[in-house]
Regions:
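Short, flexible, basic/aromatic active-site loop/helix in glycosyltransferases
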Residues: 96-121, 359-379
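Acidic donor-binding loop at a coil-to-helix junction in glycosyltransferase catalytic cores
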Residues: 140-149, 402-409
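A conserved acidic beta->alpha catalytic loop
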Residues: 11-15, 37-39, 65-66, 264-274, ...
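Conserved donor NDP-sugar-binding/catalytic core segment of glycosyltransferases
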Residues: 70-102, 326-359
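Short, acidic, metal-binding catalytic loop of nucleotide-sugar glycosyltransferases
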Residues: 19-30, 247-257
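A conserved hydrophobic helix/loop-capping motif in glycosyltransferases and polysaccharide synthases
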Residues: 3-13, 26, 229-241, 245, ...
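Short beta-strand-to-loop acidic/aromatic patch adjacent to the donor-nucleotide binding site
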Residues: 54-67, 310-321
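Glycine-rich, basic loop-to-helix element that forms the pyrophosphate-binding segment
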Residues: 39-52, 290-308
Length: 475
């Protein structure tokens, strides 16, 4: 039974013919349509929805050949009929440099608001759901049309991950995860990002998760702190980088007293001995946890809960350096000037010898006072260096993980408090083969993305509840 209308991007006859022929041989395919305009334009989405005549609609998003698995379309139809889902997407294979590799994807959550969420290249829609959702698209986007569609679709239908390998595609972007992770802050993508933010903002308003730009005030009068600021460095097995990181802290010139708290998480490579070289400097506090179950977030909590921690807790990763001796003073000044619970600066990507690397300066200029904390639910990070007002940090605490813990804290703080921004470079982020996120496996990348999406889901739920409670008090 022919139940599927197919739509494929058409750049040239040579490019599209192979996929067209493959689809036309499938007994479930009703018609194959060439799409000559961008699939990311709202107008294109509306045209596809209008042209789709079969019960289901398959949109293929790549211009490289598609090879369907054995009875793959039958399987998608069966699951679609059983579940009533609005969109199905599946695990698949990718051909990279001539080699076929597994490319599993992850489940969709309400907090999976990233515009780069990986659905794969085969999107299998219930046509009724597609048409209903396309009719609700009110903004004519150039870049965010497909993103807007899935946000609108998710309001009424399930977006269902089929955990089976149902097709093969050719992957042309062979960069590592470490190279791809900064695409969203690349200035060349700015126009696209503006549209994505607008679409996400409208979605948050539709579900009651958008926050107005009103913030709780901060009282910096908390006493009991012997120092104004503490730099926090969690570290494990970074003997080659920790000394330079420590020295970049100790050279800071400030008008206040500060210290450095290094949480040495049971290093075995000489890192402990390297830190001990600074034991005669009273500013250096060397903590070794008594327990063995701490991630980076847990190490941060240990340092922040320490009596030695100052009024402000400032980040420095053990791989990285402060740009100059004024970084700490600049950050602390920003707390008082901007009246915020958290301050985030800008950083420069470099190699180990401090030569600049693309994309260069990461300053998150997409952040605005009016909408920054809402857009934070869409983007994959908030920037660095990060600094916190210690009483608030102690009250909330970071998750005891080694990925996403800082992002979770930033989202939580931004729910109620202002986040301050410094757009000058304060920090040098050194990329090298030892970085934990330099080139992640697909399994590790998926696990990271699932966790960050879960963080967003929890935060979104908290914001929706907060808005509902606020509404009750005004009724």
């Amino acid at each position: 039974m022919k139940q599927i209308s197919c739509f494929i991007p058409y750049a040239s006859k040579e490019q599209a013919d192979k996929t067209i022929r493959a689809l036309e041989t499938e007994t479930e395919v009703h018609d194959v349509n060439r799409v000559e305009t961008s699939l990311f334009r709202t107008q294109t989405i509306k045209e596809i929805a209008a042209q789709a005549t079969a019960e289901y609609t398959l949109i293929y998003t790549k211009e490289t050949p598609l090879r369907l698995g054995y009875l793959a379309l039958q399987r998608l139809i069966r699951i679609a009929e059983d579940t009533g889902a609005g969109l199905l997407y599946a695990d698949h294979y990718q051909v990279r440099d001539g080699e076929e590799q597994k490319a599993p994807v992850i489940d969709y959550q309400s907090g999976a608001l990233r515009d780069d969420f990986d659905f794969g290249s085969v999107l299998f829609f219930n046509t009724k759901a597609l048409k209903e959702s396309a009719e609700k698209l009110t903004v004519n986007y150039r870049f965010a049309g497909l993103y807007d569609l899935r946000l609108v679709l998710s309001l009424s239908y399930e977006l269902l991950h089929v955990g089976e390998f149902l097709y093969s595609e050719v992957e042309e972007d062979c960069r590592t995860s470490g190279e791809r992770q900064f695409d969203y802050v690349d200035p060349r993508n700015r126009e696209r990002q503006i549209e994505m933010e607008q679409a996400c903002t409208e979605h948050l308003k539709a579900i009651g998760g958008w926050l107005e730009p009103t913030f709780e005030s901060i009282d910096f009068g908390a006493d009991g702190f012997e120092t104004e600021a503490s730099v926090i460095i969690p570290v494990r097995n970074r003997a080659t980088t920790i000394e330079a990181a420590i020295r970049s802290v100790l050279c800071q010139k400030t008008a206040f007293k500060f210290n450095l708290i290094v949480i040495d998480n049971h290093s075995t490579d000489g890192t402990t001995e390297m830190i001990d070289r600074f034991k005669d400097d009273e500013r250096v506090v060397h903590l070794i946890p008594t327990r063995n179950d701490l991630g980076i977030g847990g190490c941060w909590n240990l340092g922040v809960q320490s009596a030695a921690c100052g009024k402000f807790a400032v980040q420095l990763d053990s791989d990285d350096l402060y740009k100059d001796e004024h970084t700490l003073q600049t950050i602390v000044d920003a707390f008082y000037k901007q009246q915020c619970a958290m301050v985030i600066g800008a950083y420069q990507m470099t190699d180990f010898e401090l030569n600049p690397l693309p994309p260069g300066i990461i300053d998150h200029r997409e952040w605005t006072e009016e909408n920054g904390r809402n857009n934070a639910l869409r983007i994959n990070g908030l920037g660095a260096p990060r600094a916190f007002y210690t009483p608030i940090l102690r009250r909330i605490t970071l998750p005891n993980t080694s990925y996403g813990e800082d992002y979770a804290m930033g989202l939580n703080i931004s729910r109620r408090f202002r986040i301050g921004r410094i757009y000058d470079v304060l920090y040098l982020c050194r990329r090298w083969g030892g970085n934990s996120d330099a080139a992640l496996s697909i399994e590790r990348l998926n696990a990271n993305n699932v966790y960050k999406d879960r963080i967003r889901t929890w935060e979104l739920q908290a914001r929706i509840r907060m808005n509902r409670e606020a509404l009750k008090t005004t009724e």
